[in-house]
């Protein structure tokens, strides 16, 4: 036992889509809590990653990438992201080193200027640029607003992420351990199962399809005969043509999705899984409040 005071706090990770927010949180947690992909708007809900050591508990809140919404789902995502400003002690504003500052970033910066908590600028993906360019990138952002710290990292390779944790620890006040030490997230297993299926669809499909799907996990029970966990999940699409793409020729695609997702789910649950998936069409669900709520995008989340 050390006689150091226990520190804790909530840390929101904000930024444009695709800058690496979820990759960073998963790296810190040492496991996949939030799904990741090279497609923008991968994360749709706030997701906590609870990082506990003997000296501290940092509750990271991964958020949907802030963008200009084109439907009710987008509205929900952006609202959830901004709502974390009211519930956190520190903000990590993440940008990508390999992309110039855009109007998207400028919009976020205007909001962050009004934040009542310290904002740390995290320049991610430094593995993608020549080190000489870092100075100019940092100078550009710091000319726009005053940040309490600037930390360049590579979330993918893990460069400098420990320094970022140390910097965060310094910023946090003494506080209670909010969650038991073995709790890693605020979402139930069913949510993580749905997300892992959605991740494989993001990986395997293109254009509008990844954005048009939702996944629900309707049942998770242990099959007494086989001893496996029997999971029944539904993939929701917006159009008949999308259903065709998800099923694939002779069911090829859905089998591939199921196989890849099952592997991840088995690792997460530490158990054998039998995954059964169904595909359902719900026209324009992304603009229907009732459907959004049914598929886990509840307004309650940010009100
Ligand atoms: N080269 C490199 N790629 C990275 C790094 N961090 C993330 N990526 C990649 O960037 C892409 C987006 O990563 P995500 O973690 O899904 O990004 P996000 O900010 O959570 O995106 P949204 O959820 O859409 O807002 C993925 O293809 C990652 O592998 C990094 O440090 N270096
Ligand atoms: Mg994400």
Curated annotation (Swiss-Prot):
Pfam families per UniProt: KH_2 (PF07650), MMR_HSR1 (PF01926)
GO CC list: cytosol; plasma membrane
G2: annotated segments: 41-45
Top-level taxon of the source organism: Bacteria
Topology term for the membrane: Peripheral membrane protein
Gene Ontology molecular function: any one: GTP binding
Region (G1): 15-22
Region G5: start-end pairs: 153-155
Segments of this protein annotated with the region G4: 124-127
Region (G3): 62-65
Annotated GO biological process: ribosomal small subunit assembly
All residue ranges annotated as the KH type-2 domain in the record: 205-283
Record-linked Gene3D superfamilies: 3.30.300.20, P-loop containing nucleotide triphosphate hydrolases
Entries under PROSITE patterns matching the protein: G_ERA, KH_TYPE_2
Entry's localization field: Cytoplasm; Cell membrane
InterPro entries, A to Z: G_ERA_dom, GTP-bd, GTPase_Era-like, KH_dom-like_a/b, KH_dom_type_2, KH_sf_prok-type, P-loop_NTPase, Small_GTP-bd
Alphabetical UniProt keywords: Cell membrane, Cytoplasm, GTP-binding, Membrane, Nucleotide-binding, Ribosome biogenesis, RNA-binding, rRNA-binding
PANTHER family (UniProt xref): GTPASE ERA, GTPASE ERA, MITOCHONDRIAL
Protein name: GTPase Era
Originating organism: Lactococcus lactis subsp. cremoris (strain SK11)
